[in-house]
A protein has these predicted regions:
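Hydrophobic alpha-helical segments and their boundary regions
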Residues: 6, 16-17, 141
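Conserved histidines in hydrophobic membrane contexts and catalytic metal-binding motifs
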Residues: 51, 68-94, 108-160
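Short, non-transmembrane alpha-helical segments in secretory-pathway proteins
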Residues: 30-63, 97-130
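Residue-identity detector for threonine
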Residues: 9, 24, 30, 37, ...
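Hydrophobic membrane-insertion alpha-helices, especially the h-region
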Residues: 15-32
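N-terminal Lys/Arg-rich, disordered targeting/topogenic segments
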Residues: 1-9
Length: 160
């Protein structure tokens, strides 16, 4: 009786096994990433379409989701006439508020206002609404600084 030899050596089988595991991991992580970001991407597309129809937005420069007392989508962009606009859309009601960026403060001014109240390392700044007031939400550590978009005043500090 002859002993049949495997066409693959143990070393080759090991390398092939490692390659299979790596490819499976990469495919799995890619699928998870796509599924995890789908709600964000869908919301962004929906809000951009609303902004294009209601505010004549032609170029979008920024998109944010603000989760406060209610969820709002904030969008910065330029209209067909080149005017810089801020658009805030309510997740619940679909209400659309349109502001000229020149009528409000910039993101950097909102950061400065929050720093004046003690914010240190700022993680992000999102456009949203607090009640009827358009705001910038500035996150620093465990604190959230709500800065009035129009006046630049800090209207509320939340967090631990």
């Amino acid at each position: 009786m002859r002993k049949q030899r495997s066409p693959w050596t143990k070393k080759q089988q090991f390398i092939f096994g490692i390659i299979e595991i790596v490819v499976t991991l990469i495919a799995s992580l890619t699928a998870i990433l796509i599924v995890a970001t789908k709600p964000y991407v869908d919301a962004e597309k929906k809000v951009i379409a609303i902004a294009e129809s209601k505010a004549d937005i032609k170029t979008v420069t920024e998109f944010d989701i603000y989760h406060g007392e209610a969820t709002y989508y904030g969008l910065l962009g330029k209209s067909g006439q080149g005017e810089k606009l801020a658009v805030i859309v309510s997740h619940d009601s679909g209400e659309v508020d349109i502001y000229k960026q020149s009528d409000g403060i910039s993101k950097s001014v909102a950061k400065k206002a929050a720093k004046a109240y003690g914010a240190k390392d700022i993680s992000y700044v999102h456009l949203g609404k607090y009640g009827k007031t358009p705001i910038w939400e500035v996150k620093s550590g465990t604190q959230y600084y709500l800065v009035d978009f129009i006046s630049g005043q800090v209207i509320k500090v939340e967090g631990l």
